[in-house]
Amino acid sequence: MQPATLQWSSYVLQLRVTTTAILKPGELRLFKCGLGITPPSSAVVCICRDESSFTSSPFTYIDPKDYGNIPFAVQNISDLDLDLSRLPIVLNIFALPHANVNISNLPVQRIEAHDRHIIPHGQCDAKFVIYGPLTRIKIQVADIRWIEQTPEEPTRYSFKAEIWVNLQNTPLDQIFKTGNIEFISHKNVYISRILLCGNLLILKANYENDYLLDDNFYPEQLAIQISLTPQTADITLSQNQETLLKCNTHSITVCATKNIIPNTVTPVHCSFNTIFNSNSNFTGLFIPKLLLGISTTTGIWDETRPLYITMKAFKKNRRINYSQPIGVVYFFPKQILPPGNNVEFNWTEASKIYVNTESPNGPVRNTVTFTNQAVLRTPSLSTVANLTPDINMGIFLSSLRVAFDTAHMVPLHFSLKPGESTRMEFMPPGTPQNLTILEGDVGIHFIPCHNHSHRSSP
């Protein structure tokens, strides 16, 4: 009797799916097939086209809100019609366990000297409350002198100011190394840096506003509450770019630095003047968000280098708004993800499955291919006989030239509501499979692309 839901686990799931549809040259489609996953702990679920696929698909992460029924994007990049009943869509799904890092974007940076000739504001009152390993400072500042900046996005106001806090008799050993903003009285103001020079605490304040949406101007006075703790961060950012690099629990959401209407010829760049320090322990991996019609660089973010991202449209009338999420940075130990400069557009990235074998000259990666396997119409779920759980295999990202062995991956729990004709050719064991293959006409349902708009919120 066919179970109501097929459930199994594996390190890599390869989709080799067919459907009775023709994909026209340049045509872009989204589809679902009822495939779901159980949310993994501390891992990012990735999807990338297999190098054997005739269709193009982006290397991207799967948004947790889509875990119940994963959407897939495909495009015909050839000049000919693609008959999807004969030429399957081939995708690889896998999960990478990222490091559970603590991220600080407001370290207290000690400096030796600062120009104190012109006080940048009027009266500044500060109250200090010390709770052992925490110092809380409540600040009231008036007559702030804002200095206009030239923002990358021309529709925005951008001003900066300094706020000087006299530490009075507060012991310097209570001015801890990690800052946290608990309250700011104006929604468009954020603190980008905290500096300590002798007995002077300097807050670098930024005011940003879109004058097309809100014509309010910068505030002349502010109330600010900050706390300082001795917490040691695994990842320390050189500054807080709150509207562009949004720190999550263990990752950073990267947002567009300007309103972008990319054309299909000229790439558009987003540069971030922030570097990170991890004491040489971690490397960042930027994985683009699925933005229909837009291809984004996938890149390794090396320590002490600014993040630089390029986007290019391959469909007309695309738009990205200022501060709209365009991807996420996850951090991995350097032993797993070596530093590198390799970046490629995510719609051109391809992956392949490999098996590690020993040779006199050391380990060799042999690509797993299915070139002689006929395209099936009957939906089935199967394994590969010689890829038992004790075989050392992995996934290779061809453009990035990064390999992830199963030792550096985490298995996923998959589920699928099968049709009456779906065959499951193995019994789910207690241990996860290395590779499972879901193939045939599994009931693809195409989704209108406007449901996953490039204007979508984070």
Swiss-Prot record:
This is Protein U54. It comes from Human herpesvirus 6A (strain Uganda-1102) (HHV-6 variant A). The keyword Cell inner membrane does not apply. Glycans are attached at residues 76, 102, 281, 321, 346, 434, 451. InterPro entries: Herpes_UL82/UL83. Disulfide bonds: none annotated. It comes from the Viruses. Coiled coil: none annotated. Keywords: Glycoprotein. Belongs to the herpesviridae UL82 family.
